[in-house]
Amino acid sequence: TGIYYPEIDAFLKSATGVTSVHIFDHTIRVQDEGKRTGKQVRLPVATIHNDYTEWSGPKRVRDVMSEAEAERYLSHRFAMVNVWRSIGVSAERLPVVMADARTIRPDDFVASDLVYQDRKGEIFQVRHSMGQEWFYFPDMQPDEVVLLKCFDNATDCPARYTAHGTFENP
């Protein structure tokens, strides 16, 4: 994290034009169980979802920041963005898949509790409906990055959430 976080901070500022970035965690996902054993890595998520809801986005900010810092972020427009990339090898077998946000209706998002040992969260599961358009990034290389906006407190923006997951690419 000593090198990676500053690189991601600079990348997000350059790619989005934001002036402030707060990186609060990261997740490494590995399909191979042997590589997961005894390490802090998880399976790729195959269900289609979005990481935060109207309730859990601001709650997560309060969970990971001091009260003063959280209020500073929450008093202005803010977004939570995942940086998805392959590490070391191409991500062909389980690539990230996402929906065109213009094709997801608000009622396609279904709130679902996530209960951890130390906290309760909430995500959106995404139900299928006709008209949804999906795409993926084949053979993603370690030098390629996808940004997934998982929460935006601006209610008038074209995409507040990104329905996403992974799938088994035969």
Regions found by a protein language model. Give the residues of each.
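Catalytic core of Fe(II)/2-oxoglutarate
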Residues: 124-170
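Non-heme Fe(II) oxygenase catalytic core, chiefly the N-lobe of the double-stranded beta-helix
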Residues: 1-138
